[in-house]
């Protein structure tokens, strides 16, 4: 399947905070415990204080002037391999350069997806006829139930929904978003932001005869260190702390979308080779 991603840097800034409300002291305690465990594993005893984004004192405030940011100027050439060879053709890119770049991002940024990630069983929770703007549509709510036989104490379900025009036929493109609610709710249909109001994105999508899909990342991996022993990461680790090169939340969110793509490949209504995804803030980085 071909997946196109779009990152939205503006809009609803807190879109990724979709986890249920919990006692903040408990969340902080769990986050701090996870942080301390990882610090111990990598042999780091302290971190330098971060800059204050609100202070005007140059000694402690964040810098917003690009001219004095001391940018890194020696960027490596994307078309030169780590051992100094020039990439001469597409075959060399896909066989040599691209894999070594992917490995760097896995090692240094996103972590590795474990080999023991369990299967996902996609189930239809509901399917109903709805109106999206002026377009008669079908809305299907999905639950991707993850096999937890290896650790029954941890249950994981991917929440998603997809809406498409009744008259669309088969093999239609899909526009996906990382969101925080499923179903034909007013929150999912309303315009966002303070600028000129346009039609909600789902309305624009279905008017073109396409499908609009929302996946809820926090349904299968919480947005924060407090949830790293739960969700899909916790399930794969059987409730234990992560190793330094294990995957993190953003990688886990991406895994969830890959499972949804697998589902699209089994459904004649959707063309899994024509899928785009967008998100805001951390959801944008994930997309």
Regions found by a protein language model. Give the residues of each.
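Cap/lid segment of the alpha/beta-hydrolase catalytic domain
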Residues: 170-272, 278
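Boundary at the C-terminal end of the N-terminal hydrophobic targeting segment
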Residues: 9-17
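Glycine-rich nucleophile elbow surrounding the catalytic serine of serine-hydrolase chemistry
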Residues: 279-287
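N-terminal cap/lid segment of alpha/beta-hydrolase-fold proteins
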Residues: 90-91, 95-98, 107, 112-174
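Bacterial N-terminal signal peptides
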Residues: 1-9
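Intrinsic-disorder/low-complexity accessory segments
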Residues: 23, 27-34, 39-46, 151, ...
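Surface-exposed patches in mature extracellular/periplasmic domains of secreted proteins
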Residues: 47-52, 112-120, 272-277
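N-terminal pre-domain segments of enzymes
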Residues: 16-111
């Amino acid at each position: 399947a071909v997946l196109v991603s779009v990152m939205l840097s503006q809009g609803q800034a807190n879109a990724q905070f979709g986890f249920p409300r919990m006692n903040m002291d408990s969340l902080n305690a769990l986050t701090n415990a996870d942080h301390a465990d990882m610090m111990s594993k990598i042999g780091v005893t302290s971190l330098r204080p971060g800059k204050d984004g609100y202070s005007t004192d140059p000694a402690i405030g964040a810098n917003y002037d690009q001219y004095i940011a001391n940018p890194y100027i020696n960027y490596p050439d994307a078309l030169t391999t780590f051992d100094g060879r020039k990439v001469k053709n597409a075959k060399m890119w896909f066989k040599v350069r691209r894999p070594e770049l992917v490995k760097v991002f896995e090692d240094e940024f996103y972590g590795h997806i474990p080999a023991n990630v369990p299967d996902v069983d996609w189930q239809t929770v509901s399917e109903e006829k709805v109106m999206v703007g002026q377009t008669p549509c079908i809305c299907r709510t999905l639950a991707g139930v993850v096999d937890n036989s290896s650790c029954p104490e941890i249950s994981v379900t991917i929440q998603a929904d997809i809406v498409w025009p009744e008259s669309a036929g088969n093999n239609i493109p899909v526009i996906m978003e990382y969101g925080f609610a499923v179903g034909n709710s007013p929150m999912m249909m309303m315009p966002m932001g303070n600028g000129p109001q346009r039609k909600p994105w789902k309305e624009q999508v279905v008017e073109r005869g396409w499908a609009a899909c929302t996946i809820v990342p926090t349904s299968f991996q919480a947005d924060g260190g407090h949830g790293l022993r739960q969700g899909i990461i916790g399930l794969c680790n059987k409730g234990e702390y992560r190793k330094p090169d294990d995957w993190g939340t953003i990688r886990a969110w991406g895994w969830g979308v890959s499972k949804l793509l697998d589902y699209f490949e089994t459904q004649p209504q959707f063309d899994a080779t024509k899928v785009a995804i967008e998100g805001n803030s951390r959801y944008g980085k994930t997309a």
